[in-house]
Amino acid sequence: MDVGTKSYISHQEQKMTATVEQIESWIVDVPTIRPHKLSMTTMGCQSLVIVRLTRSDGICGIGEATTIGGLSYGVESPEAILSAITHYLTPLLKGQPADNLNALTARMNGAIKGNTFAKSAIETALLDAQGKALGLPVSALLGGALQTALPVLWTLASGYTAKDIAEGEKLLAEGRHRAFKLKIGARELATDLRHTRAIVEALGDRASIRVDVNQAWDAATGAKGCRELAAMGVDLIEQPVSAHDNAALVRLSQQIETAILADEAVATAYDGYQLAQQGFTGAYALKIAKAGGPNSVLALARVAQAAGIGLYGGTMLEGTVGTVASLHAWSTLPLQWGTEMFGPLLLKDDIVSVPLTFADGQVALPQTPGLGVELDEDKLHFYTRQP
């Protein structure tokens, strides 16, 4: 064996034996640009759990886990996510080979039930570090990007019709967005329908209008509400009924002309399989946090594709780190309904050194190794929650 070959093999062995050396995590509280009103809460601040994973070869990867309104959306709060990472996932992964993502995912899932938000932050950091080690963007590690700029909508959720219309007009004039989602379900059905109709009439000839009910309606209200939303020209209706009422969701998808988007009803590939098996015909909102990470979420996407169900890139209103991690996954898929990865735009500040670029109704996917973004250490320190 010549010297060159020995050197190459030694280099490869060093790369292959890099291990997880350290995992740090913080809760970072960033104010929003305005109150963001959903059916279950109103947000004035977003709490991001930021992770930095350091390998034995010195390469660092970053990740993020973010939920909505503390415990308003799901079973993991920022505090619980931080605790799971600190006390359970970190001891489990320290010293393990850092470049075998499937083995590490199996290790996490085998030892720790649920906690997909925390696992997603770790999976993201592992992918970021691996991409940097190989000189490849995360999208390449996930099979390769089909597109380097992805459509992104904006949510009109001030809670006031006139304000939402004015905000939509401004964004259309700027050319930043071509689709809007309305948050409804917190008020009486008639009030929500009047609010939606006014916005459709004001903006619907220039933009796609969708609504998100966030599970607020029972089956009867859902049937009535969805029929009226379809009649007024709404393009997509997201999770109108409880995540536990698959039967009603399936009926709506089969009976309403407007597409129904399942969000809270689908987190894992098995959820997607069950809903498809029951006859659901709409679309699935993919979210890396619900599935366990940018790689793990692709299993749900494959189930949807096999069943002929559309795909939509969903958000937990993440900051830039979580948003770009999602974008790398979404870029590998045909997204019939685009994405809603506007999270960073909802925040008053950004904790990365170079923000993402939003223009012409799209967001650009970074092409540099790893996620393609780096933390601004000063801002990270400034917004980190103190004990």
Locations of the language-model features?
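N-terminal capping/lid subdomain adjacent to the active-site entrance of alpha/beta enzymes
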Residues: 6-209, 214-216, 220-223, 227-231, ...
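Intrinsically disordered, low-complexity segments enriched in proline/serine/threonine
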Residues: 7-9, 242, 336
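Shared catalytic-loop signature of beta/alpha-barrel
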Residues: 227, 233, 244-261, 266-362, ...
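Active-site-proximal loop/turn and secondary-structure-junction residues that shape catalytic pockets
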Residues: 158, 184-188, 215-217, 241-243, ...
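Hydrophobic faces of well-ordered beta-strands that scaffold small-molecule active sites
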Residues: 152-156, 178-182, 207-213, 237, ...
